[in-house]
Amino acid sequence: MKKRLSLQLLATAGALAIGLLGSSATVQAQQKLKWAHVYETSEPYHTESVWAADEIKKRSNGKFEIQVFPASTLGKETDINQGLTLGTIDMIISGPSFAERNYKRIGIAYYPFIFRDGDHLLAYSKSPLFQEMVKEFHDKTGIQITAYTYYGARQTTAQKAFTNCEGMKGIKIRVPDVPAYRATPEACGANPTPIAFAEVYLALQNGTVDAQENPLTTIEAKKFYEVQKAIMLTAHIVDGLITQIAPHVWNKLSDAEKKMFTEVTQQAAARASALIKKREGELVDEFKKKGVQIVTMDRKSFQDAVLKNKPLESLGFTRADYDKIQAAK
């Protein structure tokens, strides 16, 4: 009897030990990832990134625990892009203009007036041309682009309204430090001034710059309308954001996990894009109600100036890629 009881106790202890080891293995297998961006918590780029993080955790049965860090919490846009390479950040959503620093070709998406509208940009994101760029970018950097989100048509805000390219002459305007972003203001004789995204509001408020350019949804979220009197509907760049996964994460994922990360981030991008397009359609009237002057532009004057003063080839892009983008449907 005593012998039988001892055997039962040993069996129970063994089962408990195996259970504890199994639990420990599960904990060890869980991966905590950092997903960074520079946008506000109210914006779809954040809310849908949080949705994607939760969805990935759910679909992986808790293997991947992703924390989303918004509003430049982990650094400026340059910092978080560098973090992918350094291994300090695991995922980001950011503009292709930063990817362009390592792979020039992808920056053609910022050439002024290259996209007709948001639908055209999203058609390009599904095109063979963009998939070719994704592969070449990955081959060069190890970073994997999994999704493309519509960011919005970039409009110009300023203290003083203008109606055409000539009216921009001499204005000190904040733009990201990327040649294609500088192309329109430079073509019109303005003075483009690079300032970190998180510092733009203060720069407008204290007069360091006279103007800035961003989509209407960003102008709302960052409250730039509080320190600017007019919004000019230039729509000079139809902008997007790319979701990127660092090499030290992507290379360790199984094929099934890579597929899952791609599917979920693409779903999040589609959700955010739809929200941005809807909100853009509402904001002109809302800004008018806030007392902001809305100015319809002579966009052809901007296009002509860009084509004359900043031709495609001068920025390092090719006519072949431009023509393929124009054909995207």
Which residues fall in each region the model found?
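N-terminal secretory/targeting leader peptides
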Residues: 5, 14, 30-120, 129-132, ...
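Sec/Tat signal peptide C-region and signal peptidase I cleavage site
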Residues: 22-29
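Bacterial N-terminal signal peptides
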Residues: 11-22
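Twin-arginine (Tat) signal peptide motif
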Residues: 1-10
